[in-house]
From Swiss-Prot:
This is Zinc finger protein 92. The keyword Magnesium does not apply. It is found in: Nucleus. It comes from Homo sapiens (Human). GO terms for cellular component: nucleus. Signal peptide: none annotated. It comes from the Eukaryota. Its main location: nucleus. The gene is ZNF92. Residues 4-75 form the KRAB domain. Pfam families: KRAB (PF01352), zf-C2H2 (PF00096). Keywords: DNA-binding, Metal-binding, Nucleus, Repeat, Transcription, Transcription regulation, Zinc, Zinc-finger. The keyword Nucleotide-binding does not apply. GO terms for molecular function: DNA-binding transcription factor activity; DNA-binding transcription factor activity, RNA polymerase II-specific; RNA polymerase II cis-regulatory region sequence-specific DNA binding; zinc ion binding. May be involved in transcriptional regulation.
Amino acid sequence: MGPLTFRDVKIEFSLEEWQCLDTAQRNLYRDVMLENYRNLVFLGIAVSKPDLITWLEQGKEPWNLKRHEMVDKTPVMCSHFAQDVWPEHSIKDSFQKVILRTYGKYGHENLQLRKDHKSVDACKVYKGGYNGLNQCLTTTDSKIFQCDKYVKVFHKFPNVNRNKIRHTGKKPFKCKNRGKSFCMLSQLTQHKKIHTREYSYKCEECGKAFNWSSTLTKHKIIHTGEKPYKCEECGKAFNRSSNLTKHKIIHTGEKPYKCEECGKAFNRSSTLTKHKRIHTEEKPYKCEECGKAFNQFSILNKHKRIHMEDKPYKCEECGKAFRVFSILKKHKIIHTGEKPYKCEECGKAFNQFSNLTKHKIIHTGEKPYKCDECGKAFNQSSTLTKHKRIHTGEKPYKCEECGKAFKQSSTLTEHKIIHTGEKPYKCEKCGKAFSWSSAFTKHKRNHMEDKPYKCEECGKAFSVFSTLTKHKIIHTREKPYKCEECGKAFNQSSIFTKHKIIHTEGKSYKCEKCGNAFNQSSNLTARKIIYTGEKPYKYEECDKAFNKFSTLITHQIIYTGEKPCKHECGRAFNKSSNYTKEKLQT
């Protein structure tokens, strides 16, 4: 027995067999081939890298390699070049050692038939297609099975029937459970494991079981944290070769997968497949529990967690349990306060790599996501998605309680608190609870002693620099946010954003009591309070309540004696209206 080579551990599929495989099976094949090659290298056996490995590392399909080889090589059939095609079929006479390879590109006339001699140079060339081949064979062995689809010629042996099945497209092996059909029995056997839940391969670290050894091998990397696949371009490391291959496309910018429907191009075939479902509206992934269908497998997986009660991954710090180990890992960072991802530009650190990636765009100033409708550009795809809803008027997030719809999920989350009355944000200093994180953040500043940001104009100090910046506008009366639609200017971006709704949406919030319409839900809420007599804004210092938040703020200034509006002459006022009057007089 000769030394072990890559050919001994290589698995080959016909085109039809390859087409029968789903994405997961193709990825498994790719990983197994790369793993086999790495093992040979580790043992010092493999010297040069086979073309198949180079091809797979680039994320390309093995059948594309065969097409590539056909362009570069002449189809030669001789035992010098193809002794290993059918080793079980021995042909003693050297004149009979004529092998016809799979070269669908070439016609019958272009095929070269070589008589087997001691040296390749001495081979006699025969031309003339199948007739020439038949002449080279004896009468007994000239029973040739021709495959017109891929110009394949076979000696009579058992695998011919198998080849015929591939080209007819028949899938004779059917699963009784689901009715799914397969080209090969081995594929059906693998598929059955899904139904039988046959998990033969168990992880000694966490006890999780798998139905394939290769899946267990991949899983073990989670525990070891090993990342053997490194990108030569940027140094980033990965625990799977397939992930490295996908990552490399970022550097090349290549987008070989184009949608025939709309012309949009993608760097991954899987992304194109997902995209196509937008046009077809296909939802192939169905939940067996409730019947709900989805267009992406990942969304179905997330949905399934609703039905799952089992949460095996528990946080030892707070007791919170999770269904997925990776989510537990991310959660733990909350307790440790660890921020392993640091920005080399400014030194700012983050607890998630995705947050660092988003942050980096601040330094580059890059805005790659452009709106086709108005030309406005954004530095994040999520921001572009939100922006597009201004043009479409889409409000995908609906409240099940009252039916009100919102453009953003975060706004819906805030809205739900109105119905529940929940106050999840509690101050550890004074015990006061808040419904919204923004209100809680503002409140915490009251307890902060350190207020390093001081206003040079009036001496007022602030704990946050952005608050000082906003405060300064009181003195300068600057209005940097200008509406392009009507020319009106504002001193705060939040007020400017609210104003823009007038132009984009009109007055969609109508009062059922008086018929008055408003462009903001907050204005409608304020109107309703007039009829109900409710006074939700209470001043804790004197227990006086108000029906408007602005009235509460005005009252607070009177109570504290603060005079934030300062004139050039030195006089200060507690109301902006009094300040305006003073300006007009001077």
